[in-house]
A protein has these predicted regions:
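Redox-cofactor binding/interface segments in oxidoreductases and associated redox assembly factors
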Residues: 11, 168, 312
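C-terminal helical "tail/cap" subdomain of flavin- and related membrane-associated enzymes
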Residues: 341-493
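Predominantly flavin-linked oxidoreductase catalytic cores and closely associated redox partners
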Residues: 123-278, 335
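FAD/FMN-dependent oxidoreductases across multiple families
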Residues: 232-234, 240-242, 256-380
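Short beta-strand to alpha-helix junction loop
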Residues: 101-122, 257-263
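N-terminal FAD cofactor-binding segment of flavoenzymes
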Residues: 43-89
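Beta1/beta-strand and adjacent pyrophosphate-binding region of the FAD-binding site
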Residues: 2-16, 34
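Glycine-rich FAD pyrophosphate-binding loop
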Residues: 25-50
Length: 493
C-alpha cells in the first residue's frame, strides 16, 4: 500500500470540500492540500444534489469569499427571494402569497451544483490543490500529530494519505463523525422526496391575471424565486435550474408521510395531483430525471471542531432543514472557523481555546436555526401563522447572524465575548416566539384563501436590515448589533 503525506487532507470534493480547499489556499498558498473524491470530474450539469438555492450568507460566501460573483451572474440564476403560496384550488392568482415584489439588496442565487463544482474544481487545481478523483475513503485513523485516511479505487488500488489535519466534507456520509462515534439525533423530524424534470416550470404561467403579474417588478419572474407551495405538515419546492431544468421537492412531517405513500415517483405524482394539482399539471408529461427520498433528514453532531487536527464542515457535521435553504450558510460558517483554526495552528499558536469557543458558537447557531422548524410543520398551511413567522425569522436572521457574518465578527472572540449577553437575550426571545409558533402549528389550520399578497418589500424593517448588510465590514458592529436587537425586541412584543 502506498503512503502519501500532505499538510491537509479533505475527505469529499463536493461544494463544502472544494470551497474549503480554495479558502485554505487563499489564506496560505504554501499549504499542501489533497482532496479525496469518490466521483470524477467534470460533473454533469444539473447533477442530482439537493442544495440548489442560497440565502444571504451562502450567496455572499460564494460571490465574495470564493470570488465567484461573475460566474454566479453568468452561469446561474439570480433568485427572486423566497415565496410562499397558500391554497390549492382555483386560479393561482387567487391563492394567498407571501413574498417580495422586487429583489432585496443582497443577491441570492439558484445554483446548478454541477456547473458550480466544475468551476471550483478548476479554481482549486489551478491553485495547486491535488484532487484524487475516483478515490473512496474507507477508513480514518486519528493518531496524535499525523492522521491517516485509507482509500481505495475502482481498480482496487489502496493508498494511505497522511496529514496533521483531516477535514471531513463527506456530506451525509459523515465519515469522521462515524469514526468518532459522534452521531447525535435532534428533536426535529422531517422527511423529503425530490426529483428534477427536463422542463422549465415558470410558475407565472399558472395565471393569466395581468393585475397579479403587475404586482412584481420585473413582471412574470416569480419563477426565479424559491417557490414554496404550502400545506398543513408539508411544503413543496419549485426551484429553477440553469438550462431549462426544474427541481421539485416535497418536504413533510411524519403525519403526512404516514397518511400518504411516497415510496415511488408514481405515488408522489398521485399525491401532487390531489394536494397541489397546479404543480402536477405543470409537470405534465415532462421526463422525470431522477427520484430521491430520505426519512428523518435532520441530525446533530457531538463536536465538529477540534484542536487535535480534525474538523467537519457542512453536512458532514450537522443538518437542520431545507425550508430556508441554510445549507450553504453552514458551509460558509464552518469553513470560516476551520480556516481560522488551520491558519493559527500553522503559525504555531495553541488553538485549544479557539476550537472550544468556535464549537460553542457553531452549536449555538445550529440550535437557533433548528428552533425555526422544530414542531412547526403543522402550521405551514396557516397563512396567518406563516406571515408572522416569516417576518420574525427574516429579521432574526438578517439582524443578528447575517450581520455578524457580513462584518467578519464570527471568528473575533473578543467581539463575540462582548456581544454574548445581547445575543443570549435575543436568542431567548426567539425561543419564546418559536414556542408560540409550535403551539399554533398543533392546530394544523388551513384558512380560506383570499387572494392576499403580503409584499415583504412593504415592510420597512425587512428593507432596513437587508440594506445594512451592504455596509463595509469595518463599520462598528457592536453598535449596530445592539440597535438591531433593540429593534427585534420591539417587533417581538
Amino acid at each position: 500500500m502506498k503512503t502519501k503525506l500532505s499538510d491537509v487532507v479533505i475527505t469529499g470534493g463536493g461544494l463544502a470540500g472544494l470551497c474549503l480547499a480554495k479558502q485554505l489556499k487563499q489564506a496560505h498558498d504554501d499549504l499542501d492540500i489533497v482532496v479525496l473524491e469518490k466521483n470524477k470530474f467534470p460533473r454533469p450539469q444539473a447533477i442530482a444534489k439537493v442544495g440548489e438555492s442560497t440565502v444571504e450568507i451562502g450567496g455572499h460566501y460564494l460571490s465574495e469569499t470564493m470570488g465567484l460573483k461573475d460566474h454566479l451572474q453568468e452561469r446561474h440564476l439570480r433568485k427572486f427571494g423566497l415565496r410562499c403560496y397558500f391554497g390549492k384550488d382555483g386560479q393561482f392568482s387567487e391563492l394567498d402569497e407571501l413574498g417580495p415584489s422586487k429583489n432585496f439588496s443582497i443577491p441570492t442565487y439558484q445554483i446548478d451544483r454541477g456547473e458550480l463544482e466544475n468551476r471550483l474544481f478548476k479554481d482549486v487545481t489551478d491553485l495547486g490543490v491535488r484532487i484524487e478523483q475516483g478515490t473512496a475513503t474507507e477508513s480514518i485513523h486519528l493518531n496524535g500529530n499525523i492522521h491517516q485516511c485509507v482509500t481505495n479505487t475502482a481498480e482496487k488500488q489502496q493508498t494511505t494519505f497522511e496529514a496533521p489535519w483531516i477535514l471531513d466534507a463527506s456530506g451525509r456520509q459523515g465519515l469522521l463523525k462515524k469514526t468518532l462515534g459522534y452521531q447525535k439525533t435532534n428533536s426535529h423530524k422531517g422527511n423529503a422526496v425530490w426529483f428534477r424534470v427536463d422542463k422549465r416550470i415558470e410558475i407565472d404561467s399558472w395565471s393569466k391575471d395581468e393585475q397579479w403579474h403587475q404586482q412584481c417588478s420585473p413582471q412574470k419572474k416569480r419563477w426565479l424565486s424559491t417557490n414554496h407551495l404550502m400545506g398543513a405538515g408539508y411544503w413543496v419546492w419549485v426551484i429553477p435550474l440553469y438550462d431549462n431544468i426544474t427541481s421539485i421537492g416535497i418536504v413533510m412531517d411524519d403525519q403526512v408521510v404516514q397518511e400518504s405513500g411516497f415510496d415511488t415517483i408514481e405515488q408522489t405524482m398521485d399525491w401532487l395531483a390531489v394536494n397541489q394539482p397546479l404543480c402536477a399539471n405543470a409537470i405534465g408529461s415532462a421526463k422525470i430525471m431522477d427520484f430521491i427520498k430520505i426519512r428523518d433528514y435532520s441530525y446533530d453532531c457531538k463536536q465538529v471542531f477540534s484542536s487535535d487536527g480534525w474538523a467537519m464542515t457542512g453536512e458532514a457535521g450537522v443538518f437542520t432543514d431545507p425550508f430556508y435553504s441554510p445549507g450553504s450558510d453552514f458551509i460558509a460558517i464552518s469553513n470560516q472557523y476551520i480556516t481560522s483554526l488551520v491558519s493559527q495552528s500553522k503559525q504555531g499558536k495553541n488553538i485549544g481555546f479557539d476550537a472550544a469557543i468556535y464549537q460553542k458558537f457553531y452549536q449555538s447557531i445550529y440550535a437557533s436555526t433548528l428552533s425555526l422548524y422544530t414542531n412547526q410543520y403543522g402550521g405551514f398551511g396557516d397563512r396567518r401563522m406563516m406571515s408572522m413567522k416569516l417576518l420574525w425569522d427574516f429579521t432574526y436572521y438578517w439582524g443578528v447572524l447575517s450581520l455578524l457574518y457580513f462584518r467578519g465578527s464570527l471568528t473575533n472572540i473578543s467581539f463575540m465575548r462582548e456581544a454574548s449577553l445581547p445575543i443570549i437575550e435575543i436568542r431567548e426571545v426567539n425561543n419564546r416566539l418559536q414556542a408560540q409558533f409550535s403551539e399554533m402549528a398543533k392546530l394544523r389550520i388551513i384558512r380560506p384563501t383570499k387572494g392576499v399578497f403580503l409584499d415583504q418589500n412593504n415592510i420597512p424593517v425587512l428593507r432596513h436590515l437587508n440594506d445594512l448588510l451592504k455596509e463595509p465590514g469595518d463599520v462598528n458592529c457592536i453598535v449596530q448589533l445592539n440597535k438591531n436587537i433593540a429593534l427585534l425586541k420591539r417587533i417581538s412584543v
